[in-house]
Design a protein with these regions (language model features):
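Basic, Lys/Arg-enriched alpha-helical interface segments
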Residues: 1-73, 80-96
Length: 96
């Protein structure tokens, strides 16, 4: 393992509640969710993107919201830019 900053693709992990919700989504919504997760995984900076915004404007490096399926759903995630194994943690998923 090197001490250099690694780049994408980032690892993605979900909390247990988010994973349960993901498994209950209809197939079309799950596909849209995978698309946004793929974009986050391969983005050089996951906190920047067309459909990404901070959950709270006062905490720019805190949790962010990424929208999917034409803004019908969103995920709240945090990017942990550790030197060893940086990852994206999906904390909450919502779809309507």
């Amino acid at each position: 393992m090197s001490e250099e900053f690694t780049g994408p693709p980032w690892a993605v992990d979900c909390t247990q509640d988010a994973e349960k919700y993901r498994l209950g989504l209809p197939e079309a919504a799950r596909d849209a969710l995978w698309e946004v997760l793929f974009e986050l995984r391969t983005s050089h900076t996951p906190y920047r993107g067309e459909n990404v915004e901070p959950a709270r404007s006062t905490v720019p490096r805190g949790p962010h919201i990424a929208y999917f399926d034409g803004f019908r759903g969103w995920i709240r995630f945090t990017f942990l830019p550790r030197v060893a194994e940086p990852q994206i943690v999906v904390e909450e998923i919502f779809w309507q």
